Amino acid sequence: MSPVFKDRTTEWHTTTQYRVFLTRHFARWLRKTSLTPAALCAAIEEMVAGLIDAELGGHVLKKRVALPGRGKKGSVRTLVATRRGHRWFYLFGFEKNERANVTPTELLALQMLASSLLDLKDDELEAAIADGTLQEICHETTPSGCPTPKPTS
């Protein structure tokens, strides 16, 4: 977030632009749940505000996301790659009733994936979107810094 001075007064506001992506594996898993892209974008908004459930190392964060009609406690867990900048990548998701957590081997693989995704240059990122490796779900700037979900079709 970059502070912006507004109208020569003491009022400050922030303008944030960030993009949210799903890996192909995560998008496939998402279709099997009742979770929506809007809920995922709202979860990113919470993480930007500092509401992170766990930092797993290697730029991988864990975030609980509520399924419709259920609270966060019994819903899904998502693993997200970010350097807390303008790019956020959903890597992996699971329902709490399916498994307790990822294994150390899975976490290491996810950390390596996170590193490679976060190191993508802009043209490489656009190529990954074009070939379906990544799907973008949020890419907007709003005065509050909140992402507006992109329509999926």
Outline where the language-model segments fall:
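Arg/Lys-rich, positively charged N-terminal/basic patches that mediate binding to nucleic acids
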Residues: M1-L35, A127-S153
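Surface-exposed loop/turn and secondary-structure junction residues enriched for glycine/proline
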Residues: V4, T23-R24, A38, H59, ...
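Enriched for short, Lys/Arg-rich terminal
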Residues: D7, A81-E140
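Preference for short coil/turn "hinge" residues that link or interrupt alpha-helices
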Residues: H13-T14, R28, M47-A49, R87, ...
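N-terminal first-folded block
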Residues: R19-L67
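Amphipathic alpha-helical interface surfaces
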Residues: L22, T36, L40, K72-S75, ...
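Short amphipathic alpha-helical patches
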Residues: A49-A54, K63-G71, V102, A114-L118, ...
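Basic/aromatic recognition patch in beta-strand/loop cores that engages polyanionic ligands
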Residues: D53-F94, E98
